[in-house]
Amino acid sequence: MTLDNLPTDTPARISAVDWSQLVEEEARRLRALGLDVGAVVRVEHRGVLFGRDPLAIRIGRMMVALRRVHACAMSVEALVEVGA
């Protein structure tokens, strides 16, 4: 599943990123924010207009607004929370 399809409030680990879908400068910035393979993320909110863009993504203690086109390049695996 890709990050743009991850249900809201579901923790997931980024399992792969197709960097070829992104402009080099955008890819560099996303890596600098920690959005790379192995990072644990959670979709907190989606936009309400224009294709539900952008997505509010939590990574650690940081909240990042991410365009859907960028989220489409990231494959994720949902994590099972302890006690769930």
Predicted regions and their residues:
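Short alpha-helix capping/helix-loop boundary micro-motifs
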Residues: 23-29, 50
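Short, compositionally biased
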Residues: 31-32, 53-66
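Short, basic/aromatic beta-hairpin or loop at an interaction surface
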Residues: 7-21
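Glycine- and charge-enriched low-complexity intrinsically disordered segments
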Residues: 68-84
